[in-house]
UniProtKB/Swiss-Prot annotation:
It catalyses: A + NH4(+) + H2O = hydroxylamine + AH2 + H(+). Pfam families: Prismane. One of its GO terms (biological process) is response to hydrogen peroxide. It comes from Thermoanaerobacter sp. (strain X514). The gene is hcp. This is Hydroxylamine reductase. It is found in: Cytoplasm. Its cofactor is [4Fe-4S] cluster; hybrid [4Fe-2O-2S] cluster. [4Fe-4S] cluster binds at residues 5, 8, 17, 23.
């Protein structure tokens, strides 16, 4: 069997993974993910009609965003999960067809995504090998379809987190279905798909705004916070991923047990929320970005809870300490399900922690963050004054993702080389390349302002729009803000599309441009939006500073 996947920044040789994913997923899992996406496109096609007829069901929305989320890079590697999810998808698809039939709605059965069938698991795997990315022959149409699909995957992840906290928007679900249905439509042109990609950007903004509302309404607005990066002498649980509801339940259930809780990776920003500060056993952040987990999980000694991406295939030395939940999966790793009441029982992982040694200290000190839009706007007068007096000459948005590539040391060197009158605005795990450098401050304003998780790139957009208003500008691109963004997976794609929708131009992406962008599509993005790559720190610095 073979595969073809180029959805992440680490696509093999900058082209695509064909034997095994650089991420670690096997060819059969990659193909099954393709078939799940194909079937979700069919469900989307049908559910649009169900919405029009008023016979759509909320469970379809949830199935859609959970299914999409499970195919994001470093979320789920479990073959059996995808076999079962595909079977559920086919059953749901047939249920929607039946509902449409009862409502007197005719369905065009010529679309393969809504009519393929199977008898055995072998049938599923055979079909999976036929419906992947390369089944679209035209390179440019394929490129645009994948750009949209990956953007919708990112949107689905953010919609999932908002939904976990009780927030949803049917307009977002409707767009996701519309976009997935349209990538099946062979009558659409490249121009149609460019327009659809920008529309995805609009709904990306809406989804990030919804998640921001969900998080801040539930846990309060992030505030300036110093986070401990050392350890205590108690056993601990390390929680990674992005799911704040999982963290809340874990903190509640570990209270008074003698077990400490540490964040890892993208969970770091949880410390910025007021609601989590009441837990004395919520100790700090352990380690760095996701790709270093193979060493850090080993040293942590206690169990690790993966709530979302990024999971790296675990080494045998700590595999028995890894627990997954939500849509995360890996064969042979313990899974903690959600109960019928929406709650999770973390007693097993807590008891496991009690049997473990305390974490090995790998660093000590503090890092500062919590500069989401509400906090930054409280500092607006100070920031505006610093800009007007020339104390701050330029802001650099360096949000995004971190990754394994050695060339990503560029971002550390770039941050070090920035003039002392510049400020970095960041969100996502890209921050780990420079958030421990001690770059100082400008009139009390730290030179690295961390807004939070990757979805908190929304905060950076809100800050930019507010600065545009304060300075009386009619174009966001006239602000002294440059965009030097590191990307890795599909959530970064929806953030990019959101920025393009908001009119931001001259965004530089690295360490490489996406493999899924064909030369012609890349040219459109360069010509229309000024998208660029990166070269080296010295030349890029001159370019950004207008020298």
């Amino acid at each position: 069997m073979s595969m073809f996947c180029y959805q992440c920044q680490e696509a093999s040789q900058g082209i695509g993974c064909t034997v095994r994913g650089v991420c670690g997923k096997t060819d059969d899992v990659a193909n099954l993910q393709d078939l799940l996406i194909f079937t979700l496109k069919g469900i989307s096609f049908l559910n649009l009609k169900a919405r029009e007829a008023g016979v759509n069901k909320e469970k379809t929305d949830r199935f859609l965003f959970e299914g999409l989320f499970s195919t994001i890079t470093n979320v789920n590697f479990d073959r059996n999960f995808f076999i079962n999810k595909i079977k559920e998808a086919v059953a749901l698809r047939e249920e929607i067809k039946e509902d449409l039939k009862k409502a007197g709605i005719e369905v065009d059965e010529s679309c393969e995504a809504i009519n393929w069938v199977y008898d055995t698991d072998e049938d599923i795997e055979a079909i999976a090998a036929e419906v992947g990315v390369l089944s679209t022959k035209d390179e440019d149409i394929r490129s645009l379809r994948e750009l949209i699909t990956y953007g919708v995957k990112g949107m689905a992840a953010y919609a999932y987190h908002a939904y976990q906290l009780g927030y949803k928007d049917d307009n977002i679900f409707r767009f996701m279905e519309k976009a997935l249905a349209k990538v099946l439509d062979d009558s659409l042109t490249a121009d149609d798909y460019v327009a659809l990609a920008l529309e995805a950007g609009k709904y990306g903004v809406d989804t990030m705004a919804l998640l921001d509302k969900a998080n801040t309404s539930t846990y309060g607005h992030p505030e300036i916070t110093k986070v401990n990066i050392g350890v205590r002498n108690n056993p601990g649980i390390l929680i990674s991923g992005h799911d704040l509801k999982d963290l809340e339940q874990l903190l509640e259930q570990t209270a008074g047990t003698g077990v400490d809780v540490y964040t890892h990776g993208e969970m770091l920003p949880a410390h910025y929320y007021p609601a989590f500060k009441k837990y004395p056993h919520f100790v700090g952040n352990y380690g760095n970005a996701w790709w270093q987990q193979d060493k850090e999980f080993e040293l942590f000694n206690g169990p690790i809870l993966m709530t979302t991406n990024c999971l790296v295939p675990p080494k045998d030395s700590y595999k028995d300490r890894v627990y997954t939940t939500g849509v995360v999966g890996f064969e042979g790793v313990k899974y903690i399900p959600e109960g019928p009441d929406g709650k999770k029982d973390f007693s097993e992982i807590i008891e496991h922690a009690k049997r473990c040694k305390p974490p090995v200290e790998i660093e000590r000190g503090e890092i500062i963050g919590g500069f989401a839009h509400n906090q930054v706007l409280e500092l607006a007068d100070k920031i505006v004054e610093a800009v007007k007096t020339g104390a701050i000459k330029r802001f650099f948005v360096m949000a995004g993702c971190d990754g394994r590539m050695k060339s990503r040391t560029y971002y550390t060197e770039f941050a070090k080389a920035l003039p002392k009158d510049t400020v970095i605005l960041t969100a996502g795990c890209a921050k780990y390349r420079y958030n421990k450098l001690n770059l100082g401050d400008i009139n009390g304003i730290p030179r690295v302002l961390d807004a939070g998780q990757c979805n908190d790139s929304y905060s950076l957009a809100v800050i930019a729009m507010k600065l545009k208003e304060v300075f009386g500008l009619n174009d966001i691109n006239k602000l002294p803000i440059s965009y030097n963004i590191a990307w890795y997976e599909q959530k970064a794609v929806i953030v990019l599309l959101a920025l393009l929708y908001l009119g931001v131009k001259n965004i530089h992406l690295g360490p490489t441009l996406p493999a899924f962008l064909s030369p012609n599509v890349t040219k459109v993005l360069v010509d229309k939006f000024g998208i660029g790559g990166i070269t080296n720190v010295e030349d890029d610095m001159k370019m950004f500073m207008g020298e």
